[in-house]
Design a protein with these regions (language model features):
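Periplasmic OmpA-like peptidoglycan-binding domain that tethers envelope proteins to the cell wall
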Residues: 2-11, 15-18, 23, 29, ...
Length: 152
């Protein structure tokens, strides 16, 4: 991502097309129609649990403060917008309903590269560029049907 931008880099689109295809054709996304998984799914159903499948995008920014004239109030908003743009594109490419997708933003608080001790300006800018990213996670987990907000 460019600094202060949530727009997807057009150069990343071929990779996103591949990721969308992987999601669409993955065994996990077809689990309900495959005989070999019926015993597992029945066991989950009988235990009153559900199998949740989620494609999650986690957005990140560099450490630079957001200027007053920006479209975003802070790095949390910017990182969230990056993640949201990515999941919307992946949903489109995977040809899947958006309920499988989630997006969240961490702002500058989970950097890939710690920049505290980097003195060289070009190395610092390179590190900041690495921190401007969205990470994609493909999760499957079992959730109790009885689980509610009151129990958490």
């Amino acid at each position: 991502f460019k600094s202060l931008s949530a727009d997807l880099n057009p150069e990343a689109d071929p990779i996103l097309v591949q990721i969308g295809g992987l999601i669409r054709t993955s065994t996990l996304m077809k689990i309900n129609s495959q005989k070999r998984w019926k015993p597992l799914l029945e066991r989950i159903r009988l235990s009153e649990d559900t199998l949740n499948i989620e494609i999650r995008a986690e957005g990140h920014t560099d450490d630079k403060p957001i200027p007053m004239n920006s479209n975003f109030r802070n790095n949390w908003e910017l990182s969230s917008a990056r993640a949201l743009n990515l999941v919307q594109r992946l949903s489109e490419l995977a040809e899947m309903d958006q309920h499988y997708f989630s997006a969240l933003g961490y702002g500058e608080f989970r950097p890939k590269v710690d920049i505290k001790n980097i003195k060289d300006r070009s190395l610092l800018e390179e590190a900041r560029a690495q921190n401007r990213r969205v990470e994609i996670y493909f999760d499957a987990f079992i959730r109790s049907k009885n689980e509610s907000i009151e129990n958490i």
